[in-house]
UniProtKB/Swiss-Prot annotation:
It comes from Pseudoalteromonas atlantica (strain T6c / ATCC BAA-1087). Belongs to the ClpX chaperone family. Component of the ClpX-ClpP complex. Forms a hexameric ring that, in the presence of ATP, binds to fourteen ClpP subunits assembled into a disk-like structure with a central cavity, resembling the structure of eukaryotic proteasomes. It comes from the Bacteria. PROSITE patterns: CLPX_ZB. ATP binds at P121, T122, G123, S124, G125, K126, T127, L128. One of its GO terms (biological process) is cell division. This is ATP-dependent Clp protease ATP-binding subunit ClpX. Keywords: ATP-binding, Chaperone, Metal-binding, Nucleotide-binding, Zinc.
Length: 425
């Protein structure tokens, strides 16, 4: 639509070339070569494109869902050991996204949601498994700490803030958020303080479990856009949490004793009594594999909450050999990460085998699992990383067992000299 003259002189009233509205009827008019488009038409075009993408995207992604074997294989690249947990997760995640892509109801049968509960000691790989799954599937991922959550109306973090964080990860794209994965850590810390409900309010225990129930099962969560504070006049984003996969994790210290106690209940006195031999007690990891919902109720989780987490799996405590593998084998292993950092300074970093063994031993003694490996390596290499950028001609840094034990400094090998020097020289 050509410009129309309004009044005398150079005053021209401009019109949108698409809808015909004047510049006074719209908020903004964008100019192009001899044409104009208003903000309302731009928004309308965006809506049309979004709707078309929604129709095309599911068809494109139908063939992209990896099989359980492919998911397991990808997890193998980043997570050492935990074969049973990886198999359980691969199947549960595959079924969840198959359900999303084919609808909740198939041939008249409603497909239930497969949220997951991971049990295992600190540093056994619970968080890494969840992160790796999200990265493989290219879906938004967020973590929450159950210990910071409280019931609505109390000081602390509201459970709906979890969905807020997920939206932030995908620029408040609701469709993307609804395909996301939420990992809630330290879930064992919100267990009820005793088997009997207390008269007093337990705002960080059973109360949080009650608050999480609907969120995990599936509800329409109202979240303020762009992180704004809630107020009555504000439009909320509506997020359907029934499409979000929730993975809850915790160490569940002492749960093995609950399982063991159940295994020995019902035994009588006399000849039929099973003798409890401490030398024949199963390891904690083996006991966790035998967990039943009733054990989790005894531990302090309410039955309704356990019912929303139908997939239960446990992770074993990592052995010294597994920790050495973690240091060396995964695609993003610690030794490879630090070697890449040193390569940016044109320096090669070498960890000798006895150094890896010493790091694993130290992590085992600290009982921090794989999580403690980085802090050990960081402390060992701190002085070297501080000095190296100011030094020249260092071609290689070697770390051996004595360095890990604090008896010596890393060995520096120079280009210009055949001799070796330590960082302290």
């Amino acid at each position: 639509m050509s410009d129309k003259q309004s009044g005398d002189g150079d005053n021209k009233l401009l019109y949108c070339s698409f809808c015909g509205k004047s510049q006074h009827e719209v908020r903004k008019l964008i100019a192009g070569p001899s044409v104009f488009v208003c903000d309302e038409c731009v928004e309308l075009c965006n809506d049309i494109i979004r709707e078309e993408i929604k129709e095309i995207a599911p068809k494109q992604k139908q063939d992209e869902l990896p099989t359980p074997k492919e998911i397991h294989s990808h997890l193998d690249d980043y997570v050492i050991g935990q074969e049973h947990a990886k198999k359980v997760l691969s199947v549960a995640v595959y079924n969840h996204y198959k359900r999303l892509r084919n609808g909740d109801v198939h041939d008249g049968v409603e497909l239930g949601k497969s949220n997951i509960l991971l049990m295992g000691p600190t540093g056994s790989g619970k968080t890494l498994l969840a992160e790796t799954l999200a990265r493989l599937l290219d879906v938004p991922f967020t973590m929450a700490d159950a210990t910071t959550l409280t019931e609505a109306g109390y000081v602390g973090e509201d459970v709906e803030n979890i969905i807020q964080k997920l939206l932030q990860k995908c620029d408040y794209d609701v469709e993307k958020a609804q395909r996301g994965i939420v990992y809630i850590d330290e879930i064992d810390k919100i267990s009820r303080k005793s088997d009997n409900p207390s008269i007093t309010r337990d705002v960080s225990g059973e109360g949080v479990q009650q608050a999480l129930l609907k969120l995990i099962e599936g509800t329409i969560a109202s979240v303020p856009p762009q992180g704004g504070r809630k107020h009555p006049q504000q439009e909320f984003l509506q997020v359907d949490t029934s499409k979000i996969l929730f993975i809850c994790g915790g160490a569940f210290a002492g749960l093995d004793k609950v399982i063991e106690q159940r295994a020995h209940t019902g035994t009588g006195i006399g000849f039929g009594t099973a003798i409890k031999d401490s030398s024949n007690k199963s390891k904690e990891g083996e006991l966790l594999k035998k967990v039943e919902p009733e054990d989790l109720v005894k531990y302090g989780l309410i039955p309704e909450f356990i019912g929303r987490l139908p997939v239960l799996t446990s992770l074993e405590e990592l052995s010294e050999e597994a920790l050495i593998q973690i240091l060396r084998e995964p695609k993003n292993s610690l030794t490879k990460q630090y070697a890449a950092l040193f390569s940016l300074e044109d320096t090669e970093l070498e960890f000798r085998e006895d150094a890896l063994q010493a790091i694993a031993k130290k992590a085992m003694s600290r009982k921090t699992g794989a999580r403690g490996l980085r802090s050990i390596v960081e402390a060992v290499l701190l002085d070297t990383m501080y000095e190296l950028p100011s030094m020249s001609n260092v071609s290689k840094v070697v770390v051996d067992e004595t360095v890990i034990r604090g008896e010596s400094k890393p060995i520096l090998i120079y280009d210009s000299a055949a001799d070796k020097k330590s960082i302290s020289e």
